[in-house]
Amino acid sequence: MSSNRTVHSDTSTLKMNSAVQISCLLLVLGCLLGSGHSQSEAEFAAKSREISQIFGNPSVDKYTKARNFPKLIAFYEKYSSRLHLTAQEKNNIDNSIKQYRAQQNHQVDGVSAQGGKLFDVLKKIIKVIVMVVDSTKANEERQKT
């Protein structure tokens, strides 16, 4: 009978070790995901400030804004799910980005087309994204306090 108890005890210990190992693994994964999320928060905040400083500042000239427009697109594509946009705003921005890329790919004498009607559309898009970025930052600041 004592051998039965030993086998049962060894099985219980093995199950307990597995449970402890799984718990430790889950704890480590939770910490990694949590720190990744906080890094993402810090990165989002830094990129938001950068976008606002370039595109939200009326003293920045249109050439600087045009030169940094790829940064704005990259920001939008990476963080669009965090920006509080209506379906219509998102659709308009997506369409404008497609038009912008098509225009950039269309070259005349080896030079991308510039300015024109699309630049006016992009100004509106920039205004919407900057407004949403600013309101998102303000909401996140309020939630911290």
Curated annotation (Swiss-Prot):
Keywords: Immunity, Innate immunity, Secreted, Signal. The lineage of its organism: Eukaryota, Metazoa, Ecdysozoa, Arthropoda, Hexapoda. Its main location: secreted. Belongs to the Turandot family. InterPro entries: Turandot. This is Protein Turandot E. GO terms for biological process: cellular response to heat; innate immune response; response to bacterium; response to heat. The keyword Signal applies.
